[in-house]
Amino acid sequence: MLAPLLLVSALNLGAAPDPLAGPRAEAQALVLIQQTLQWYTATVGETSIQAETYLGHDRLFSKETIARFRKAAKEKGISADERRAREYFQAYLAGEYLSQSTAKYDDKAQNAALQATVRLPWMKDPVPYKQLDLIVADEKDAGRRAEIEKARSEIQKTALNPILAEKEATAQRLARELGYRSYVELSEESRRAQLRPFMVEGKRFLDATDAMFKELVAEVSQRELGIPAAQLRRSDFNRLFKAPRHERFFPADIAVPSFKAFLGGMGIDFKTVAGTEVRVDDAVNPLKEPRAACWGIRVPSDVRVNVKPLPGLDSLGVFFHEGGHAVMFANTTTKVWEFQQLGPGALTEGLGETFRYAWADPVWLRRYRSFVQAHNAEAKRNDPLMSDQDIRELSRLQILYQLYYLRRYAYAKLVYESVLHGGSPSLWKGIYDRPTSDPMALYRDVFSTAYAVPMDESDALRFRTDVDDTFYSLDYARSFALAHLMSEGMRAKFGADWYGSPEAGKLIRTIVAEGNKTEAEDVAKLFGVPFDLRPAEARLRRLVAE
């Protein structure tokens, strides 16, 4: 066995080793391990040991390695793809450096949240803080929902916000230590997008949709909750979007078969381009995470989705979103790891939202009704079928949901987080011209505008917990814009019922083939339109008018 080894060594003597290969291989192995562990934590309740996975990787996430890749991304003579891959990798390193350095604050906040309980007068025992989202969405009484939020705010005020204030200051300092002018600059580099232009567009969208949004709020809140618009509060939106009147149309075990039917109409199966099946864990395990999630363990061959079957459209919508991630991972053909796993999230989140947004479209809702009818016959079930009036009402509820989140992210989140993260006032000049020195007051003002409901102090105390690290909020805002753009583009190319077009499925596979190398602007060019919120506005107005 010695001779072949000596021959290999001799052949490699003249080849200079790639100084970037080692960190890349180390990161690939680390991400593989982390995602596999996350899968078992989510599906069977294994104790999370993510922190331990970073042990021994200090050099990988050091300032020196980050600086090396930052310099390498500017190197002359490399291909455009290699440059972009290096940029993605450098942004990954910088983000992980911040995450590790601020992990102690996340751990403190997480532990404080896990240990915290609140007293609700109508409940015998203290209620865990972590269960309040579920409780407020299930609570039928508006007064009690407000009390739940007030109790939650006390935990935020006393236990969580002081910790998160320290985290914010530390993150801003660390960004400057890495050579960035600010935390905002680091975040824009990570998202590969500029905040200012999208904030301008977000404000335009907010103003343009204000009358439509308020009319829908008045109509839908009265019908779904029996609450006049003047009495609606932020604490009511969780219950509103849970759509309790329509829950009977979406039994807990319908998620996987209905999603496969959704894909099947477009000629997409739930298999990978490597020939393997997308692995779906839909077991009812009491220890599993209740929210659906997706992992591209090895792209494209090992793609996994976790879902804990729950009734209702809110749960089903989340599964469709995660199914969008799975379809992207499963149909990615690029061999470049950075394009498989790293980079901005706008495309993968956008595909997920495109699938979720189908639930506002009466065309898909009628297809779903036909699916349930066939499913009943095949499985000898008797699940109720939506009437045409049910479809109309559910569509309008979903239109409101989509408007709400676009106004929240494209306007309120971006303005607020630009200020919170120490951005230059030039970012929000002309978009928000009121005082910004008090973050809690600012939060209360911009979110009250976005939601079109008054916000009290208990609502405003969310100003530390309602924050996305490194402006993932920008990825979300861009993904919402992309989802509407893709939905309108598909409709223009393949007709109103593009859900039944195999050509639409082919186009989706083409869009995702290069993974995250394809950015939102690239998709907009494919459909021949600028990347902005005008397709979203047009689609929502069209659906309201139908």
Segment roles from a protein language model:
Residues 2, 6-11:
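Hydrophobic helical h-region of N-terminal Sec-dependent signal peptides
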Residues 14-165, 431, 465, 471, ...:
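N-terminal helix-rich structural modules
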Residues 41-51, 69-74, 182-185, 319, ...:
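C-terminal, non-catalytic "cap/extension" segments appended to globular domains
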Residues 107, 153-304, 309-313, 526, ...:
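Contiguous, non-catalytic segments that form substrate-binding/exosite surfaces or channel walls
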Residues 149-156, 188, 239-247, 275, ...:
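Glycine- and acidic
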Residues 202-212, 342-384:
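Post-HExxH zinc-binding segment in Zn-dependent metallohydrolases
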Residues 229-236, 290-302, 322-333, 378-391, ...:
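Active-site-adjacent bridging/hinge elements
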Residues 314-333, 349-353:
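Active-site recognition of the HExxH zinc-binding catalytic motif
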